[in-house]
Amino acid sequence: MIETESTGLLTLYSDVRAAAVHWLWYPFIASGKITLLQGDPGDGKSTMMMRLIAELSTGGATPNGCPLGRPQRIIYQCSEDGVADTIKPRLEQCGADCRNVAFINEEVYGGLTLDDERIRQAMMEFRPKLVVIDPIQAYL
């Protein structure tokens, strides 16, 4: 064994207490963590997220059948589709409770970037269980 001490810059992993991961959708989306959903255009990434949002907003189940519990709030921020003609109809078609799904209106408040204070403010006020940024490249 190598003898060493923790310094101000480094922490030894032996000094870290392991913690359990809490899952929103096991084993795909961990609660409180950043998860990237990647795929080619047309693979169904947005459709899958819409279905998960719908289930989460109504307290349904994950795509693999795990119950989600009580209805939760979600922020779905999308730059590629129209809110009224595409996003809301898709949410309704998936059975979402749109009273639990919100977005920052970029037409009213201007464009967003990932480091925008308005995202943090929206999260503090709305307290979502899930925040979806679709696609992330549009907000870099």
Where are these regions (language model features)?
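Residues at the beta-strand->loop junction immediately N-terminal to the Walker
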Residues: 38
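Alpha-helical interaction segments
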Residues: 13-15
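Walker A (P-loop) ATP-phosphate-binding motif of ABC ATPase nucleotide-binding domains
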Residues: 34
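Conserved inter-motif catalytic segment of the P-loop NTP-binding fold
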Residues: 3, 10, 19-20, 24-26, ...
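Hydrophobic positions on the alpha1 helix immediately C-terminal to the Walker A/P-loop
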Residues: 48, 52
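Gly/Ala-rich phosphate-binding loop of Rossmann-like dinucleotide-binding domains
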Residues: 57
